[in-house]
Design a protein with these regions (language model features):
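Carboxylate-rich, polar loop motifs that coordinate divalent cations or form catalytic acidic clusters
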Residues: 1-754, 760-779, 783-784
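Ca2+-coordinating acidic residues in Ca2+-binding motifs
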Residues: 424, 572, 845, 877, ...
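Short coil turns linking two alpha-helices in DNA-binding domains
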Residues: 725, 853, 905-906
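Membrane-proximal linker segments that couple transmembrane helices to downstream signaling/catalytic modules
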Residues: 781-888, 913
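Short, Lys/Arg-enriched C-terminal cap helix and immediately downstream tail that follows
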Residues: 868-873, 920-928
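Sequence-specific DNA-binding recognition helix
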Residues: 888-926
Length: 933
C-alpha cells in the first residue's frame, strides 16, 4: 500500500509549471471569493493553519480538530490515539507543515505528530521533545525540522532525534513566532518581544533591525527577491539592502496588526491582518501599494495550493478561497441599476447597443455609456432584438409592440397592421440581400428592400408557430428555427415548392453552418435545441447526430453558441458550456465513447446562470476580439476564451476506504486474500479545488466488469459489488478534471476472494467419496445378511412433481457434481446478466438458459436455496432495488422507476416483496441507509 500512495507523490510536481495563479494585473476585488463554514461541513470556524499533502488533500488545523478536504467533503481526522493523551485532554492542532518528502507534521497542544504512509505517530516530552505545546514549525534546506514552543525555546528534529537549543546557545528569547531560512542558508528566528536572532555553527546571534523597538513580531517571510518582510503589531516592515521601510494603514494595509505573510506563484505578496487581507503591489520604482478585501475577517493563515488558489484561514469566519474569475462583469452605471438588460447588439467597431425590459436603449462606446435613448411609445415594453439595415437605420424588436425603425432621431413603428406576423418579436436577422427577417411568436416576417412586408406562418408551411431565430446559409437558403423544427426556404423564397424540413417536432433554437466541413460529407449544420441537445446535420445524406447528456453534454437545453479556437461555446440551462468541435466530430464517427464538456457558471465568476431572452440571438454576441457577451438576469457576463487557461494538472485519484461485508478494512495494513467474503464497497475521491463538482470518474473491477463504468459528475463516489464469486480481482478507478485532463494511472487495489473450506471442490469431492463409501458399505452388509434373497436393484423412476404444491423431489436424477455446475451457471445469470430484471422471466425460460429441465431447476432452487421460484426471483429483485435506492434521488418517482427497472409489473407485488425481505417500506429503507452513511 505505501507504494500505491507514493505514485501520486511523484506524479504531480512535474506539472506545476502548467498552471497560472492569481493575475497580479487584476484588481483584488475581481477575484472570486468562496467561503466554507461549519454549515458546509468544516469542523470549526477558526482555521489556524493550512497545508496540502502530495496526494492533493488540503489539511486544516481548526478550533475543533484536524480536518481533511478534497474539494467536496470535509473529514475530521483523529491524529492522536486515546492512549497517548490523558482523559481530560483534547488534542488541538495548532500548526501544520508538509516537508520536502511530503510528510505532514502537526504541532499541537500535546506534542508533535508525524503523518507518513497513512499512519500517525506522536512525539512528546517522553521522546525528547522539550515541551508539548508547539507554536511554530519549519524545515531547512538540509531537511531538519525546527520546532518552537508556546513558552519555551526551540528544538531541531533530525534522524529521529530531538536537539534542544536555548539561552545556553545564545538564544536569549522564547516565544519564537517565525523561523525563516534566507537565500544564503542562514536561519533567522523571530521572537515575539526580543527581536530576531540568526543561527550558524550551532550558535545564535542577535540580528539587529532598526525600527523594531516596542514592536511585537508576529510573522516573518522572505520573498523571491530576497526582501525580508516582518509583520508586527504596529505594521509591516520590509528589509533589504536599500534599507528598512515601514508600512501601515496609511499605505493601504487593511490593519496595522499583521498576523501572516506569504507570496504566491505570481509574486503577489499577501498579508493577513486583524482586519482583512491585503495584497502588496511592488512597483518598479521601489514603492508599494496595497489593495484590501474581507476587512470584516481576522486572517490567521494563508496557503497557495498546487492549482494556484489562495486559501485563507480566519478567526471565526471559516475557510475562504481566492481564485481567478473566468468572467468579467459589465453593468449599467449605478443610476441605471434598476434597468434589466434584455438584448445586446455589436454595431460599429467599439460600439455596443443594449436594450432593457423597461424600453430604454443604451449606446456604449469602448465600454463607456455615451447615449441613452427612450423611444416614444416604448416605456415599460421590453426590447428583445436590435439590428441595423443596409441604409444604417437601427431596428428594435419588442415584446408586444412590433418593431421600430430609428431614422435619425425619429422612430417608425411596424405592427400586425403593417403586415407583421405578430407583435411579439424574438429576433431580427439581415440576409445578404439586405432583407430584414423578423422572428415572432406567430411565424416570420420579411421586409424587403422596397419596404414591402410578407409573412410566412404555419398555415403557409412553417414547421411550428413560435420562431426563435433565422439563419442564411452559403447557398442563400433561409433556415427558420421554430418550436416545432426547422423550415428551409430555398433562395429565401416563401412561395417555393421545394421547402425542406428537419427535426420535425423538436424545438430548434440556433443554427450554424460549419465553415470547414469534411469534403465528402458536404455541408454540415450545427443546431441547438431546447431540450434535445445539440444536433449535427450532414446534408449529403441527411444524417442527424445528437449530443445529449447521455453522450457527455452537461445539459440538453442549448441556446445560442459560438465557434472560437476549435471549441464550441454554448449557452445552456447548465451555464456556459465548452466542448471541442473535434471531439464532437469524433463521437459522430464513433471515434470516442464520450465527449468532455466543461461548464462555466457562478463558481467561475458569471453573474448568474439564468438568462433573459435566451432563445434569441440577441441574448449573446461575439466581438471582433472573440470576446463572448452573455445577457443574464443580473447583467452581462463577459468571457474571453483566449484568456481561459486549461488546468493541465490531472487530479490525483485515491481509494479512501473499503468495506467488506459491512466492516471497514484498514488500507494501511492491506491484505490481499479474503476467505468467504462476498460484498465489497469502495469509496474513492480525487482531491481538486478549481471545479471539484465537475470531476468525472471511470471505474472497473477487473475479473468482474468487462468494460469501464462511467460515473458522471456530482454522483456519490462510492461503488458496491455484491455476491462476488471466488476469484482474483483488481478494482481500478481513474478521473479527469473539468478541462478533460485524465489521470489514467488512477488508483487500484488487487485482491483475491477464496471460498470457505466447505465451498471448495476438494471438500465437495471428499463428501461424495465418503457418501459413496457409505453407500457401498451399506449395500455390501445388506447382501451379507443371513436369509436375504438376491434381488435385482430396480432403477428409480423419475417422477414429475407439481412445484406449486411443493411436492418432494423423489428419485431425482441430478447428481451432486452436475448440480454444482448448474448452480454456477445460475449464479452467473443472476449476478452478472441480472436476468431477474426481465419482467417476463419464467421457470421455463430460465431453465432453458441453463440447459436443464424446469423440473430440475425447480429442484435446485428448492433443495439448494430453500426457496420456490417466485421467492428466488423476487429476492434478487429486491436486492437490486436496495442498491438503486442507496444512490437514487428522493421521491416516489425514483422508487417506482426502480421497481419497474428490476422487473416488477405490479407496484403492489413490489411493495409486498420489499416489506417481506426488508421488514420496512422502500422509503423507510432509504432513510435508514442515509442515517448509516
Amino acid at each position: 500500500m505505501p507504494g500505491r500512495k507514493w505514485l501520486v507523490i511523484i506524479l504531480f510536481p512535474l506539472t506545476l509549471l502548467q498552471l497560472w495563479g492569481l493575475d497580479p494585473n487584476k484588481s483584488i476585488n475581481k477575484y472570486l471569493l468562496d467561503q466554507w463554514q461549519t454549515s458546509e461541513g468544516l469542523p470549526g470556524n477558526m482555521v489556524i493553519s493550512i497545508e496540502q499533502t502530495p496526494d492533493g488533500f488540503l489539511w486544516l488545523a481548526t478550533s475543533d480538530g484536524l480536518a481533511r478536504f478534497d474539494g467536496i467533503e470535509f473529514s475530521t481526522i483523529p491524529f492522536v490515539r486515546d492512549e497517548e493523551i490523558s482523559p481530560l485532554e483534547n488534542a488541538e492542532p495548532i500548526t501544520l507543515l508538509v516537508n520536502q518528502e511530503g510528510i505532514l507534521w502537526i504541532g499541537s497542544n500535546i506534542g508533535l505528530t508525524r503523518f507518513r504512509n497513512g499512519r500517525f505517530k506522536t512525539f512528546t516530552t517522553q521522546h525528547g521533545l522539550s515541551e508539548n505545546r508547539i507554536r511554530h514549525l519549519t524545515y531547512d534546506m538540509k531537511g531538519n525540522l525546527w520546532i518552537s514552543f508556546m513558552s519555551g525555546y526551540v528544538d531541531r528534529f533530525s534522524e529521529e532525534k530531538f536537539t534542544p537549543y536555548n539561552d545556553t546557545h545564545g538564544l536569549e528569547a522564547t516565544k519564537i513566532n517565525a523561523i525563516v531560512e534566507d537565500r544564503s542558508g542562514n536561519l533567522l528566528f523571530a521572537s515575539r518581544e526580543k527581536g530576531i536572532f540568526s543561527f550558524r555553527d550551532g550558535r545564535f546571534f542577535p540580528y539587529p533591525i532598526t525600527g523594531l523597538d516596542n514592536r511585537h513580531i508576529i510573522a516573518m517571510y522572505q520573498d523571491r527577491q530576497g526582501d525580508l518582510w516582518i509583520g508586527t503589531n504596529k505594521g509591516l516592515l520590509r528589509v533589504n539592502p536599500r534599507g528598512i521601510t515601514s508600512y501601515d494603514s496609511r499605505q493601504g494595509l487593511s490593519h496595522e496588526y499583521v498576523i501572516v505573510i506569504t507570496e504566491d506563484s505570481e509574486r503577489n505578496l499577501w498579508v493577513g491582518t486583524l482586519k482583512g487581507l491585503s495584497r502588496v503591489n511592488r512597483k518598479s520604482d521601489g514603492t508599494i501599494g496595497c489593495e484590501s478585501l474581507a476587512k470584516s475577517f481576522t486572517v490567521f493563515s494563508l496557503f497557495e495550493d498546487r492549482e494556484k488558489s489562495l486559501w485563507i484561514g480566519t478567526e471565526n469566519s471559516g475557510l475562504l478561497r481566492l481564485k481567478d474569475s473566468k468572467f468579467t462583469s459589465f453593468a449599467l452605471p449605478p443610476r441605471l441599476q434598476e434597468e434589466i438588460i434584455s438584448s445586446i447588439f455589436s454595431d460599429r467597431p467599439g460600439d455596443t447597443w443594449i436594450g432593457s425590459l423597461g424600453g430604454r436603449l443604451f449606446l456604449f462606446r469602448e465600454n463607456r455609456l455615451v447615449e441613452t435613448i427612450e423611444p416614444p411609445g416604448l416605456s415599460g415594453t421590453g426590447i428583445s432584438a436590435i439590428a441595423r439595415d443596409n441604409e444604417g437605420n437601427l431596428w428594435l424588436g419588442t415584446i408586444g409592440k412590433g418593431v421600430f425603425q430609428k431614422k435619425n432621431t425619429a422612430f417608425v413603428q411596424f405592427t400586425t397592421r403593417e403586415g407583421l406576423a405578430d407583435n411579439l418579436v424574438t429576433s431580427i436577422y439581415r440576409d445578404n440581400h439586405g432583407n430584414l427577417w423578423f422572428s415572432t411568436f406567430n411565424g416570420v416576417s420579411v421586409r424587403y428592400n422596397d419596404g414591402t412586408i410578407k409573412s410566412f406562418q404555419s398555415g403557409d408551411g412553417l414547421s411550428g408557430k413560435v420562431v426563435n431565430n433565422i439563419y442564411e446559409d452559403k447557398s442563400r437558403n433561409i433556415w427558420i428555427a421554430a418550436d416545432q423544427g426547422i423550415t428551409v426556404l430555398p433562395g429565401g423564397k416563401t412561395a417555393s415548392s421545394n421547402i425542406k424540413y428537419y427535426l420535425t417536432g423538436v424545438p430548434a433554437v440556433f443554427i450554424y453552418e460549419d465553415p470547414s466541413p469534411v469534403e465528402k460529407e458536404g455541408p454540415v449544420f450545427w443546431i441547438s435545441t431546447d431540450g434535445a441537445g445539440l444536433k449535427r446535420l450532414t446534408l449529403k445524406d441527411n444524417m442527424i447526430y445528437s449530443y445529449t447528456v447521455e453522450q457527455g453534454m452537461a445539459a440538453n437545453s442549448i441556446y445560442q453558441f459560438f465557434a472560437v479556437h476549435g471549441n464550441f461555446w454554448l449557452m445552456s440551462s447548465s451555464g456556459i458550456l465548452r466542448v471541442s468541435k473535434k471531439e464532437l466530430e469524433l463521437l459522430a464517427k464513433r471515434g470516442t465513447d464520450k465527449i468532455n464538456c466543461t461548464s462555466f457558471g457562478k463558481a467561475d465568476g458569471m453573474q448568474s446562470d439564468e438568462y433573459h431572452n435566451e432563445l434569441s440571438r440577441h441574448s449573446a454576441l461575439q466581438t471582433k476580439d472573440d470576446e463572448l457577451w452573455f445577457v443574464t438576469i443580473k447583467g452581462i457576463s463577459i468571457l474571453n476564451p483566449g484568456k481561459i487557461h486549461v488546468n493541465k494538472l490531472a487530479p490525483p485519484v485515491i481509494i479512501e476506504s473499503l468495506f467488506i461485508d459491512g466492516q471497514p478494512i484498514p488500507l494501511d495494513r492491506w491484505q490481499q486474500v479474503f476467505i468467504g467474503k462476498r460484498n465489497f464497497k469502495f469509496h474513492f475521491t480525487a482531491p481538486s479545488f478549481l471545479s471539484p463538482e465537475q470531476i468525472k470518474f471511470k471505474y472497473q473491477l477487473q475479473g468482474f466488469n468487462k468494460e469501464w463504468i462511467f460515473l458522471p459528475p456530482g454522483k456519490e463516489r462510492v461503488v458496491n459489488y455484491r455476491n462476488l464469486e471466488p476469484g482474483d480481482y483488481t478494482f481500478k478507478v481513474i478521473a479527469c478534471n473539468s478541462d478533460g485532463v485524465w489521470n489514467r494511472t488512477g488508483d487500484s487495489l488487487t485482491f483475491s476472494v477464496k471460498p470457505l473450506f466447505y465451498e471448495t471442490t476438494i471438500f465437495k469431492i471428499a463428501v461424495l467419496l465418503v457418501l459413496a463409501a457409505l453407500l457401498t458399505g451399506a449395500v455390501y452388509f445388506y447382501k451379507k445378511r443371513p436369509g436375504t434373497e438376491k434381488t435385482k436393484l430396480q432403477p428409480v423412476q423419475k417422477q414429475e412433481e407439481n412445484e406449486e404444491d411443493n411436492i418432494k423431489y423423489k428419485g431425482s436424477n441430478l447428481n451432486p457434481i452436475f448440480a454444482d455446475e448448474c448452480m454456477k451457471k445460475l449464479k452467473y445469470l443472476m449476478s452478472v446478466e441480472k436476468v431477474y430484471c426481465d419482467a417476463e422471466i419464467s421457470l421455463q425460460s430460465l431453465a432453458k438458459k441453463i440447459s436443464i429441465t424446469p423440473h430440475q431447476l425447480s429442484q435446485l432452487i428448492n433443495e439448494r436455496l430453500n426457496r420456490n421460484f417466485s421467492d428466488f426471483i423476487n429476492y434478487h429483485r429486491i436486492e437490486e432495488v436496495k442498491i438503486i435506492l442507496e444512490s437514487a434521488d428522493e421521491g416516489d418517482e425514483s422508487i417506482t422507476n426502480a421497481a419497474h427497472q428490476v422487473g416488477f409489473n405490479s407496484l403492489t407485488a413490489f411493495y409486498n416483496a420489499f416489506k417481506k425481505y426488508t421488514h420496512m417500506t422502500p422509503t423507510q429503507y432509504r432513510k435508514e441507509m442515509k442515517k448509516k452513511s
